[in-house]
Amino acid sequence: MTNKLITSNLKNSLIFFGLLFSINLITNAQIKVGSLEELIPYLDDDNVNVKLKPGVYSITVEDVANGKYKKEVKLKNVSKVLLLFEGSNSTYDFTGVTINIETKVLQAFGKYQVHELQIIGNNNVLKNLTMIDDGSVHDAPARRATNIVMDGKNNRIEGFHVTTKGSYPYGYGDAFGKGGKVVIPHRKHSACLIRGESNHLKNSKFIHRSYGHCIFMQAASNPLIEGCYVEGEVRKTDDMLAETSGPAFNVDFMTVWGYKLPKGYMLSTGEAGIRAYNAGETIIDGKEYRRGTSNPTILNCTIKYMRTGVTIAHATGKKYVEGCTAIACENGFSLGSGEAVNCSADCVFGPVYSTTYERDKNYNADITILPASEPYYNGSSSVAYIGGSNHKITLKGGDETVAEGLFIKVGGDKNSIRLMHGNFPHQNDFKAHSFNLNNQTKFPVKLSHKSENVKVKSVGKITDLGVDNNIEQINK
């Protein structure tokens, strides 16, 4: 081969690789847009890197009336979607961006459910968006609404800050209905629904002022929720009973549970902080799936003032919770089975852990009971409620956490506000057998008459009303 030919081949190779490099730069170059109108055409694109100019943007009823938001997704029901991310392998950077969404927008589509933001593509990253529902907490959707819905696979939402408002009735939690049976018809508004395959919610903050779940999972396989903060509101039932007008007053405070709202309990005005369901629908690669939630992982999340902190009892497969904290919730953790590692909760308004069903088994937990974050108002008197079998549970905490009249219950009556007068008997008065409880706190332990073959080591006083329990009082 001549020197001239070698030089020519080398030159052609350099040109070829230069073109490839240039194409790669063009493909991955960040596209900057300055309005929502400019952003929307990129939401169904693959392989784009888009940045919305920092600033405050609004979505109004007038925008809907003018036809600016026409997207919809049909999955069991039709959902109207404001921002629908249909593409794949794309990144959307919302650093410094706030989108104010008028709460009246949730009524502007008529009797359709509304999703403010939904992903149905794959391998996308959405980051650093502030979403605010702008209006009254009482501006309920015409049907129901969700701020964020994640379908598709391998998507990540990171660094979001979401303020959720607009539901009916607001201020009573689930006392007057949550599912099919209701005393007061409700229109819920949840914050974030995770579905699909291996979707990831990371380092996001939710200020929840709505009747509905904050973060929940349906038809989700291998979901990961990491580093999130959830904050709802709570309200004393005594304050509800003091009302002299309004929806609860109009039904004489008769709950969906079949009796008048009891005094002495604290209820969240929302629902669960983090919750998993055993049913649902999702769409991945254009195909619809109907299934439950499997293999959820919850890491380093904090949940405050919600009905439950982390409740994933209805999920299947491996259920793993680590480094999570529940503060001033009605209930801290309910996993059914699975692991809660290095978690913490207070029992200010309810138990740090509660068994969901009598069939629950193989629950391994390490929970530190925190000092009270505010005055105790725990109507159930439960520090923890443990039924089922084959668990290994360790409860830790310093002397400052102990409050008079509260105790760890092993089986028997939960004394829950929702389970009085024989209501939902399948959720109460459980047998408890064949597990280990290591109570390193001074809270007393009460082994009910439905406990059997439970091995207990406890710093706190033990009362044993069961059969063949193995108890050991330990000094600390």
Task: Describe each region flagged by the PLM.
Residues 81-83, 112-118, 145-149, 180-197, ...:
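Right-handed parallel beta-helix
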Residues 1-30, 120, 151:
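Bacterial Sec-dependent N-terminal signal peptides
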Residues 37-44, 60-65, 79-87, 92, ...:
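Short, T/G/N/S-enriched strand-turn elements that build extracellular solenoid repeat scaffolds
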Residues 61-62, 101-107, 135-142, 166-174, ...:
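Short glycine/acidic-rich loop motifs that flank beta-strands on beta-rich extracellular proteins
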Residues 27-38, 56:
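Right-handed parallel beta-helix/beta-solenoid
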Residues 52, 92-94, 121-128, 152, ...:
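All-beta strand scaffolds that present successive hydrophobic residues in beta-strands
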Residues 40-45, 59-91, 100-127, 136-156, ...:
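Extracellular beta-strand-rich solenoid/capping regions of secreted or surface-exposed proteins
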